[in-house]
Amino acid sequence: MSSAVIFVESATPGTLTEFKDLLAKQLLEVRETWSLEFRTYRTLVKDFPSREKLLYSLTFPHHDKKTVLIRNSLAWVLGTAEIPDNLQTCSTGLSESIDQLLASKLSNMWAQRQVIRGDAGQTLLITGDVTVRIINLFAATGFKGLLIELDNLQSATSLANITDLLNEMKVKVFKVASAPGLKSEDVEVVDSSSTMESGNEALFTLAKQYIEVLE
């Protein structure tokens, strides 16, 4: 089972409805709504190598309420109010998220660079048992774009099916991040490959795909 993430920066808020309408013929079931939060932090420690200056935090309520922290090739997959072992001394011991900890106890080390959020996204099951999640994303500056998350892709054909719909909508520019083995000649695929320290590999791969299209 593989995933892919597509981001359409040139979209308008109404693009989501147009895309959903095109999926109607393939629709098997409408499922739960979902949300997303993507944060980027930059280190304030001057002697860090440039490649280590960014930390990414992605919170996925629709994936068991997990938060994925990624810094270079290391990742931590955390549950609600779960703190990595090496940061336990910074925690108050109360129910706090890793983002709350970064904003309070670790604010002298990490500065929040950007926050991208999406709420009330839609989940659709389509032909081929592919799960399509669509959501409008917003940043502090306003509307950011349309994001599409695909789960249970079995082949490049499943991915091309979705990108073909975007082409039908005359969407000329969009970013695609796909797991290895799902490359399509019709789209520019960002390869998501890295190693993780521990945790949920599939969720780590998905988080890397989000970073590739949103950065």
UniProtKB/Swiss-Prot annotation:
Cell compartment(s), UniProt: Nucleus
InterPro entries: Mediator_Med20 (IPR013921)
GO biological process, one term: regulation of transcription by RNA polymerase II
Gene Ontology cellular-component terms listed: mediator complex
The UniProt record lists the keyword Transcription: yes
Pfam families: Med20
Keywords of the record: Activator, Nucleus, Transcription, Transcription regulation
Main subcellular localisation: nucleus
Molecular functions (GO terms): transcription coregulator activity
Domain of life assignment: Eukaryota
Cited function: Component of the Mediator complex, a coactivator involved in the regulated transcription of nearly all RNA polymerase II-dependent genes. Mediator functions as a bridge to convey information from gene-specific regulatory proteins to the basal RNA polymerase II transcription machinery. Mediator is recruited to promoters by direct interactions with regulatory proteins and serves as a scaffold for the assembly of a functional preinitiation complex with RNA polymerase II and the general transcription factors.
Record text on subunit structure and interactions: Component of the Mediator complex.
Family of this protein: Belongs to the Mediator complex subunit 20 family.
The protein's name: Mediator of RNA polymerase II transcription subunit 20
Organism: Candida glabrata (strain ATCC 2001 / BCRC 20586 / JCM 3761 / NBRC 0622 / NRRL Y-65 / CBS 138) (Yeast)
